């Protein structure tokens, strides 16, 4: 069982005509790096675009002191950070658009595009997918945005959007696998 994880200490949800908003926060790196992490997500009302902003920040005086000490003692230009977006094994992912985006092809034929604001390095790396009922993990990939947090606040913006030429109604569910209502 995986138990080494940060605990989400704040969660806010709201729905607007433009879409749904979700805010999450944890202070999982406060003790070691003086950084807390928040993620703002906005899902468009038509479901075709997810916009995210991840913020790593030293917010309290104690966090700022810890972050400064880490930077000074290590003579660092910044603390190494990585945002990881794990993909399902059935998703075919490829770096696209001159290294500025990742194209994601689903079994259904849907194409989605992951983009970022350019403040970090974009890469695809190996990962594993843990599935209930399977004894062994399945090999997969993850999108990684990596860089340095060199200030008290570092923001990284990204989007996951359905490609324009993909029809609205396609779904990757196999109708034969869906349960039949009784």
Where are these regions (language model features)?
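CBM-like, beta-strand-rich accessory domains located in the C-terminal region of large
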Residues: 1-182
């Amino acid at each position: 069982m995986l138990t080494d994880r940060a605990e989400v200490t704040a969660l806010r949800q709201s729905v607007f005509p433009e879409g749904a908003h979700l805010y999450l926060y944890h202070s999982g790196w406060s003790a070691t790096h003086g950084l807390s992490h928040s993620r703002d997500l906005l899902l468009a009302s038509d479901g075709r675009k997810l916009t995210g902003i991840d913020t790593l920040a030293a917010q309290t005086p104690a966090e700022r002191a810890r972050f400064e000490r880490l930077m000074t003692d290590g003579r660092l230009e910044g603390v190494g950070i990585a945002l990881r977006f794990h993909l399902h094994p059935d998703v075919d992912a490829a770096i696209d658009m001159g290294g500025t985006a990742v194209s994601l092809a689903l079994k259904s034929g849907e194409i989605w595009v992951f983009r970022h604001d350019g403040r970090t390095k974009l890469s695809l790396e190996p990962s594993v997918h843990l599935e209930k009922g399977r004894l062994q993990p399945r090999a997969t990939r993850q999108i990684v945005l990596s860089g340095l947090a060199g200030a008290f606040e570092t923001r990284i913006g990204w989007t996951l959007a359905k490609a324009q030429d993909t029809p609205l109604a396609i779904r990757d569910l196999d109708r034969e696998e869906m349960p039949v209502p009784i």
